[in-house]
């Protein structure tokens, strides 16, 4: 079974950037490592975007179906280490703030491998918005309250599941070094 490492945080926290940097370092060290992102299948992503669905039950089930394909694909690759840019904790954080029962979301996702380490990149919403504005991804005013609630939920999940909380405002080089050190303590890097 590969080691599962997930990167979580609100939009704009820097998950993708950090995951890519860590991937590059581990690859250079000679590890059979893959970097993936959720949602995984293009079809699910497009379906959700086109329909504009905001129903938390439907979204949870779609993300979980996508995750089943994702995990199957990962296992076929036979990696030593899997770096995941979002995993089921994202579903818990985002869908529970829309009113869905957290325990039900956990149950729906209970058959998926648990991550060995979860890194939560914590950032204040106003700082995340500044980063997102650069990419011009969405209407900010609509998202601020949601991101505040999701950040709060992520911090609750961090306490509940013992995530490693990283200050997303730190320099990327520092975050990369710290993250690689933690992963190496788990996989005994050479």
Curated annotation (Swiss-Prot):
It comes from the Archaea. It catalyses: dTMP + ATP = dTDP + ADP. ATP binds at residues 9-16. Pfam families: Thymidylate_kin. Its EC number is 2.7.4.9. PANTHER family: THYMIDYLATE KINASE, UMP-CMP KINASE 2, MITOCHONDRIAL. Belongs to the thymidylate kinase family. This is Probable thymidylate kinase. It comes from Sulfurisphaera tokodaii (strain DSM 16993 / JCM 10545 / NBRC 100140 / 7).
């Amino acid at each position: 079974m590969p080691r599962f490492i997930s990167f979580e945080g609100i939009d704009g926290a820097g998950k993708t950037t950090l995951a890519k940097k860590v991937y590059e370092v581990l690859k250079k060290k000679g590890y059979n490592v893959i970097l993936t992102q959720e949602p995984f299948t293009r079809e699910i992503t497009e379906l959700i975007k086109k329909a504009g669905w905001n129903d938390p039950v439907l979204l949870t089930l779609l993300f979980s179906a996508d995750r089943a394909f994702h995990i199957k694909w990962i296992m076929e690759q036979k990696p030593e280490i899997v770096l995941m840019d979002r995993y089921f904790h994202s579903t818990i954080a985002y869908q529970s703030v829309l009113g869905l029962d957290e325990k039900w979301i956990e149950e729906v996702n209970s058959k998926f491998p648990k991550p060995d380490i979860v890194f939560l990149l914590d950032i204040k919403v106003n700082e995340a918005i500044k980063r997102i504005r650069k990419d011009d991804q969405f209407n900010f005013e609509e998202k601020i309250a949601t991101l505040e609630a999701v950040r709060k939920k992520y911090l609750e999940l961090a306490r509940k599941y013992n995530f490693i909380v990283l200050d997303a405002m730190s320099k990327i080089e520092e975050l990369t070094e710290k993250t690689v050190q933690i992963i190496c303590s788990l996989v005994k890097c050479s």
